[in-house]
Amino acid sequence: MNIKEFLSNKKGASGIGTLIVFIAMVLVAAVAASVLINTSGFLQQKASTTGKESTEQVASGLQVTGVTGVNSTDSENITHIVAYITPKAGSSAIDLSQAKLFVTYNGVSAVLKANESAIDGTSGTPDVLSATLLSNTSATEYQVVSLQDFDGSVAKNQVINKGDLVAIRISTGQVFSSTKGIPTRAHVSGKLQPEFGAPGIIEFTTPATFTTKVVELQ
């Protein structure tokens, strides 16, 4: 083999080696790009999910539109109260069966859960202040009564959504048994806390005297 053939063969081998290195670099770049694309897609989906959850957390919640109490002729104290609850504007559906009611008076803080069955009051608004609806309330449970429930979600599953209105019955005579309910000039605070979203706030001070059986408290 003369010198010209040797140099020619060497250049050919060098060219093939360069081509192999180039192909390897292209493959590595392709794999890296694929990993970056997949990672980017995952992060984008994760960010979207997190953003949606954050929006629901901020927008969702309950609102207390009023609280009414009934004073007993026996103890002359408020033996049960009714809080009217509706979802906040823009709120997602909320499962009231998982909501906890926190109520505090006279150094006693009670935590109540929903009774397992809601009362359907949409066919004809029931007397939510009557004693007959107290059978499902106790010192540890409150009663949900649906007043507006277009899709029947409250009556079926105790799920409150847009346009719904419910009454929450609380037996304060049993919750605060030591005082046989809530007397005059008493400060009461509480909240109905759902699984997610803002709670419905209950806070009132009873009047100096109870001149009527039914008392508007909040």
From Swiss-Prot:
This protein's UniProt keywords: Archaeal flagellum, Glycoprotein
Q: How is it modified after translation?
A: N-linked glycans consist of the 779 Da trisaccharide beta-ManNAc(Thr)-(1-4)-beta-GlcNAc3NAcA-(1-3)-beta-GlcNAc.
Cellular-component GO terms for this entry: archaeal-type flagellum
UniProt organism field: Methanococcus voltae
Q: Which GO terms describe its molecular function?
A: structural molecule activity
Does the keyword Protein biosynthesis belong to this entry?
no
According to its UniProt entry, the function of this protein is described as: Flagellin is the subunit protein which polymerizes to form the filaments of archaeal flagella.
Major place of residence: other
Which GO biological process entries does UniProt record here? Answer: archaeal or bacterial-type flagellum-dependent cell motility
Carries keyword rRNA-binding? no
Q: Which residues are glycosylated?
A: 38, 71, 77, 115, 136
Q: Which PANTHER family match?
A: FLAGELLIN B1
Kindly list the places in or outside the cell where this protein is found, as annotated in its UniProt entry: Archaeal flagellum
Q: What is this protein called?
A: Flagellin B1
List the Pfam families. Arch_flagellin
Q: Which gene encodes it?
A: flaB1
Q: Provide the residue ranges of the propeptide in this protein.
A: 1-12
Q: Which family does it belong to?
A: Belongs to the archaeal flagellin family.
| InterPro entries, alphabetized | Flagellin/pilin_N_arc (IPR013373), Flagellin_arc (IPR002774)
